[in-house]
Design a protein with these regions (language model features):
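Non-catalytic terminal/accessory segments
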Residues: 1-176
Length: 176
């Protein structure tokens, strides 16, 4: 990603020249010029778009997980909690879920992702409850049988942080 206010063709030509000297080349299919103030673009799993702050009027980059990245993590959660995995002990399922979700969250946590992480947390809770309900043949939706204390306290499910790190105090983040 290269940002510039103008002369994009000249900058792109310069980049190609420098890479050519290093005997490297740009992939033409993946290389594109975008006006980030008007349209979004995806880069390394993030969707980046310029937004205006309604209070100050200043433009800032809004960096969120891409739709493809969210779809992928939800697919992984579904795969780990599907009916085929009912024979596997719940401790193993929770361990595998924690590894996948902790890794994904660690990568995407530093963008403007509070809304996406809140949605993912609700999705994860619901999938784990559904898995446990099917495993133990419960007919209810599972909120009473498997409350938050059970999911996070007893089972040890990873609690997805739903607020961005810069909105928390240093003590709350575990930093000094």
């Amino acid at each position: 990603v290269v940002t510039c206010k103008g002369g994009t063709e000249r900058v792109l030509k310069g980049i190609k020249t420098v890479l050519g000297e290093l005997k490297l080349n740009l992939n033409e299919e993946k290389t594109k010029i975008v006006d980030a103030r008007k349209e979004s673009f995806n880069f390394l799993g993030f969707t980046i778009i310029a937004k205006k702050n309604p209070k100050t009027g200043k433009t800032f980059p809004l960096i969120r997980p891409s739709k493809k990245a969210i779809k992928h993590i939800k697919g992984e959660i579904k795969r780990l909690t599907c009916r085929k995995t009912l024979a596997i002990p719940k401790e193993t399922i929770i361990k595998n879920l924690n590894e996948v979700v902790r890794g994904w969250t660690g990568y995407f946590y530093y963008g403007n992702c509070s809304r996406d992480l809140t949605t993912l947390k609700g999705f994860l809770d619901e999938r784990v409850r559904t898995y446990l309900r099917r495993k133990h043949c419960k007919k209810s939706r599972g909120y009473r049988a498997y409350p938050y204390k059970y999911l996070y306290g007893m089972l040890g499910l990873y609690k997805i942080p739903t607020t961005a790190p810069w909105t928390q105090t240093a003590k709350a983040c575990g930093r000094r």
